[in-house]
């Protein structure tokens, strides 16, 4: 398993919030508010963890320049990591 994948899986396993956010996004493109609603997490927590997930290349923001209504989706690394974690 490559180093990036190991880091991604470790990051997701170490926080239930990160895992919930990645799982909520899945194959969709969502705003932080939509993610907060789906996960029942507070919006400020969602925003904080999205920033962290973006820094680790698990999610990407499609409209970085927008102040409101930013859209997030999983990167290939994020999709691969969640697939590995849910595979039994």
Where are these regions (language model features)?
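Basic, amphipathic "hinge/linker" alpha-helix immediately C-terminal to the N-terminal HTH DNA-binding motif
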Residues: 66-85
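Beta-hairpin "wing" of winged helix-turn-helix
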Residues: 56-67
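Short amphipathic alpha-helical interaction segments
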Residues: 41-55
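Short acidic, hydrophobic short linear motifs in intrinsically disordered regions
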Residues: 30-38
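Short, locally clustered residues in the helix-turn-helix/winged-helix DNA-binding domain
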Residues: 23-27, 86
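Pre-recognition alpha-helix immediately N-terminal to the DNA-recognition helix
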Residues: 16-23, 80
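Short capping segments at the starts of secondary-structure elements
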Residues: 16, 27-31
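Short alpha-helical segments that sit at the start of domains
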Residues: 1-19
